[in-house]
């Protein structure tokens, strides 16, 4: 089953909004074209960076439809399908059309803080409910619970359609255990732009990126250099991103990346509550950092 190739850089696409709060579909079309023109390896739609919890069912369907129509099977499309209600996730998988989708990204259940056995059972039933390739997503800073290496490996070994994990725990030792003991064909992806070089250095095959929304060509080049063993030149590019990494998350994601895209003239600086744009002081820092990055 493990057929989808996730090597390289996938980009977790933002959702642009107009000043009136509606989805800015023309801006979204532009962003997807921008990613394609700059050589990304795959797209992630309706993830955390997309502000998916604030999108209506109709908006989610239209966003996926639009992205599929623009991409036209040139690169894989991964759609976020997760939640803390196992039956609701299964219902979604059983009732919606995923015919043009290459894989799903499914987050560890959040808020209700399941045990490791609960996490295992959650993904077991999801894996049994679909033939789609599944990318596990471990992000304890958001979910409130960490999926251990042991649970991740158990799922990877038990279900052929669980093909990868986006690891955003920040725990390099834990991620290393997964990489060392994973079954053949199972792919480990960095869920953190800043840690991507370190994780590729121990065997990760790429990254699901936020900064790639802004700099797909430059960040993608860094990832490819690292994967091809040119760590020296990859580190040079990584160093150029240092301040931008900080600004991405200083007031939360996607506030930082949306501020950057606004400075570049791609989108309105608009988020949906309870998320808000970065403060003016941070916005000014973003402007200066982008100017410095462009002149390097």
UniProtKB/Swiss-Prot annotation:
SUPFAM superfamilies: Aldolase (SSF51569). GO terms for biological process: diaminopimelate biosynthetic process; lysine biosynthetic process via diaminopimelate. Its EC number is 4.3.3.7. It comes from the Bacteria. Pfam families: DHDPS (PF00701). Pathway: Amino-acid biosynthesis; L-lysine biosynthesis via DAP pathway; (S)-tetrahydrodipicolinate from L-aspartate: step 3/4. One of its GO terms (cellular component) is cytosol. Pyruvate binds at residues 49, 208. The active site is at residues 137, 166. It is an enzyme of class 4 (lyase). SMART domains: DHDPS. Catalyzes the condensation of (S)-aspartate-beta-semialdehyde [(S)-ASA] and pyruvate to 4-hydroxy-tetrahydrodipicolinate (HTPA). NCBIfam families: dapA (TIGR00674). This is 4-hydroxy-tetrahydrodipicolinate synthase. It comes from Azobacteroides pseudotrichonymphae genomovar. CFP2. The gene is dapA.
């Amino acid at each position: 089953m493990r057929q989808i190739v996730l090597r390289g850089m996938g980009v977790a696409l933002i959702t642009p909004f107009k000043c009136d709060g509606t989805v800015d579909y023309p801006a979204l079309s532009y962003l997807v074209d921008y990613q394609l023109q700059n050589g990304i390896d795959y797209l992630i739609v309706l993830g955390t960076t997309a502000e998916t919890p604030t999108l209506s069912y109709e908006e989610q369907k239209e966003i996926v439809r639009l992205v599929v129509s623009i991409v036209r099977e040139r690169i894989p499309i991964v759609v976020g399908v997760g939640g803390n209600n196992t039956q609701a996730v299964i219902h979604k998988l059983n009732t919606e059309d995923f015919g043009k989708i290459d894989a799903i990204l499914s987050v560890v259940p959040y808020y209700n803080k399941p045990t490791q056995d609960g996490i295992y059972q959650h993904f077991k039933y999801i894996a049994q409910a679909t033939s789609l390739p599944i990318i596990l997503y471990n992000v304890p800073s958001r979910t409130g619970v960490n999926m251990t290496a042991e649970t991740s490996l158990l799922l990877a070994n038990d279900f052929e359609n669980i093909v990868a994990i986006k690891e955003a725990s920040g725990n390099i030792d834990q991620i290393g255990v997964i990489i060392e003991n994973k079954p053949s064909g199972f792919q480990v992806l960095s869920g953190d732009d800043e840690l991507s070089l370190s994780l590729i250095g121990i065997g990760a095959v790429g990254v699901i990126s936020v900064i790639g929304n802004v700099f797909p060509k430059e960040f993608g080049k860094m990832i490819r250099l690292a994967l091809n063993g040119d760590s020296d030149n990859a580190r040079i590019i990584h160093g150029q991103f240092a301040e931008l990494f900080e600004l991405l998350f200083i007031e939360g994601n996607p506030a930082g990346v949306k501020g950057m895209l606004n400075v570049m003239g791609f989108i309105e600086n608009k988020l949906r509550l309870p998320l808000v744009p970065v403060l003016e002081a941070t916005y000014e820092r973003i402007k200066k950092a982008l100017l410095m990055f462009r002149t390097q």
